[in-house]
């Protein structure tokens, strides 16, 4: 039997399973690495030749629960909620 159509029916073992970090079915069972995000490496896997993939998973594509408000707080000088001391006017 060759490596073509007849042999494809005999393939039934999964080489990839779900990844804990990205949730895709890209975690290689034997290598123990994710082909999509690079888990368990500390840094996320990203390549310049995959610009579309970068765009899909970059900052701003999720909830941004904290970052959403940083620009507004920056404009106001990161106020802490404590009133400024009154300076006597001349």
Curated annotation (Swiss-Prot):
Per its Swiss-Prot or TrEMBL entry, what cofactor is needed?
A: Zn(2+)
UniProt entry tagged with the keyword Lyase:
no
Tell me where in or outside the cell this protein is found: Cytoplasm
- Entry keywords, A to Z: Cytoplasm, Metal-binding, Ribonucleoprotein, Ribosomal protein, RNA-binding, rRNA-binding, Zinc, Zinc-finger
Tell me the InterPro entries matching this sequence. Answer: Ribosomal_eL37 (IPR001569), Ribosomal_eL37/eL43 (IPR011331), Ribosomal_eL37_CS (IPR018267), Ribosomal_zn-bd (IPR011332)
**Which of this chain's residues are annotated to bind Zn(2+)?**
19, 22, 34, 37
Top-rank taxon: Eukaryota
Annotated GO biological process: translation
Which Pfam families does the UniProt record give? Answer: Ribosomal_L37e
Renumbered to this chain, the signal peptide range is none
Main subcellular location: cytoplasm
> What task does this protein carry out?
Component of the ribosome, a large ribonucleoprotein complex responsible for the synthesis of proteins in the cell. The small ribosomal subunit (SSU) binds messenger RNAs (mRNAs) and translates the encoded message by selecting cognate aminoacyl-transfer RNA (tRNA) molecules. The large subunit (LSU) contains the ribosomal catalytic site termed the peptidyl transferase center (PTC), which catalyzes the formation of peptide bonds, thereby polymerizing the amino acids delivered by tRNAs into a polypeptide chain.
Q: By its UniProt entry, which PANTHER family does this protein fall under? A: 60S RIBOSOMAL PROTEIN L37, RIBOSOMAL PROTEIN L37
Q: Which NCBIfam families match?
A: PRK04179.1
Q: State the name under which the record lists this protein.
A: Large ribosomal subunit protein eL37
Q: Which organism is it from?
A: Candida albicans (strain SC5314 / ATCC MYA-2876) (Yeast)
Which taxonomic lineage is given here? Eukaryota, Fungi, Dikarya, Ascomycota, Saccharomycotina
Q: What is the gene called?
A: RPL37B
């Amino acid at each position: 039997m060759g490596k073509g159509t007849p042999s494809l029916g005999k393939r039934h073992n999964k080489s990839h399973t779900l990844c804990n970090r990205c949730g895709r079915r890209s975690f290689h069972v034997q290598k123990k690495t994710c082909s999509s995000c690079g888990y368990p490496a500390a840094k996320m896997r990203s390549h310049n030749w995959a610009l579309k993939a970068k765009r899909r998973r970059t900052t701003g594509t999720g909830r941004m629960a904290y970052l959403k408000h940083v620009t507004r707080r920056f404009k106001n000088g990161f106020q802490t909620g404590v009133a400024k001391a009154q300076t006597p006017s001349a």
